[in-house]
């Protein structure tokens, strides 16, 4: 159902985003890979998509927290691909710290990238979706946004905000045939999470192990193609938030 469509993936040069790009490309979607700073990594991802999946793939450097930069990037994607039908908002950062010692700039940076960046991309992509008469948006939130997490008040707040944004966008855009859902990963083994083998929270995961980036990518693929699902938050967490 994604063959020949164009998917835009933010934070697509590594980790969960990279896995999502490969999954969508394997389904036949052309991919626009948005990255923050590592051009070589983004181009490596695109080259693999072209070589192994035979799809069009281009990379775009963009600070999604910048409203104007996001607008310019979407305009360039439109010029390159003509349209787009899929948006996966995966770009995210952490600036962990105890609340009493957290710097204002660390709180703002996380909210700006994780929450405002997602708003910026949805805001500028909506026009493409309306003209295409279809659209599937998937926002990558976190179980931290559902449960909270000590030392991550900024990150948890940003991810909780994504859940509210997802449901509001779903209600607003449903009459136009545009769906919006979210995936809430738990402990996923990536370069962003680092080595968590000694984290006591792992003992609370009913399945007894960390997830993999491909587990999240599979959930995204489902939501992209599930034409009668909108406004939902799909947990991929091994049962930790039950």
Residues of each region from the PLM?
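C-terminal substrate-recognition "lid" of short-chain dehydrogenase/reductases
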Residues: 134, 212-236, 241
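Substrate-binding pocket helix/loop in short-chain dehydrogenase/reductase
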Residues: 98-99, 103-111, 201
């Amino acid at each position: 159902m994604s063959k020949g469509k164009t998917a835009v993936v933010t934070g697509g040069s590594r980790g969960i985003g990279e896995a999502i790009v490969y999954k969508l490309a394997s389904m036949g979607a052309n991919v626009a890979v948005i990255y923050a700073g590592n051009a070589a990594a983004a181009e490596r991802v695109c080259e693999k998509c072209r070589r192994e999946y035979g799809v069009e793939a281009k990379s775009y450097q963009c600070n999604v927290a910048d409203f104007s930069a996001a607008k310019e990037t979407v305009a360039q994607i439109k010029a390159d691909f003509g349209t787009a039908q899929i948006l996966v908002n995966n770009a995210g950062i952490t600036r962990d710290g105890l609340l009493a010692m957290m710097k204002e700039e660390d709180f703002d940076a996380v909210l700006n990238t994780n929450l405002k960046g997602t708003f910026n991309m949805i805001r500028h992509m909506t026009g493409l979706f309306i003209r295409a008469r279809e659209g599937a948006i998937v926002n990558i939130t976190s179980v931290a946004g559902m449960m909270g997490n000590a030392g991550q008040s900024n990150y948890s707040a940003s991810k909780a905000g994504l859940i509210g944004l997802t449901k509001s966008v779903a209600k607003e855009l449903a009459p136009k045939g545009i769906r919006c859902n979210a995936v809430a990963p738990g402990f996923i083994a990536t370069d962003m999470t680092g080595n968590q083998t000694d984290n006591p929270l792992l003992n609370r995961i009913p399945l007894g192990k960390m997830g993999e980036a491909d587990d999240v990518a599979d959930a995204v693929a489902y939501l992209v193609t599930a034409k009668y699902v909108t406004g939902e938050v799909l947990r991929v967490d091994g049962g930790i938030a039950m």
